[in-house]
Amino acid sequence: MFTYYQAENSTAEPALVNAIEQGLRAEHGVVTEDDILMELTKWVEASDNDILSDIYQQTINYVVSGQHPTL
């Protein structure tokens, strides 16, 4: 049996956003919050893995909530 709980201080979302930010910056030079959200949305739509889709969706929520300091 699995137990779901919300982590108080999750580091997955900031790390994933930073990785996306670095990749997009290398490709385009400039990165906006919308760029990161579009990239994550593409990943959610392309993923066949429910766990990864959930992680990507949680990261979208993290970015939209304004918790990421560099955006």
UniProtKB/Swiss-Prot annotation:
Q: Which InterPro entries match?
A: Biofilm-dep_modulation_Bdm_put
Q: Which Pfam families match?
A: BDM (PF10684)
- Cross-referenced NCBIfam families: PRK11436.1
* Protein name in UniProt: Protein bdm homolog
According to its UniProt entry, this protein's organism is Escherichia coli O6:H1 (strain CFT073 / ATCC 700928 / UPEC)
Q: Which gene encodes it?
A: bdm
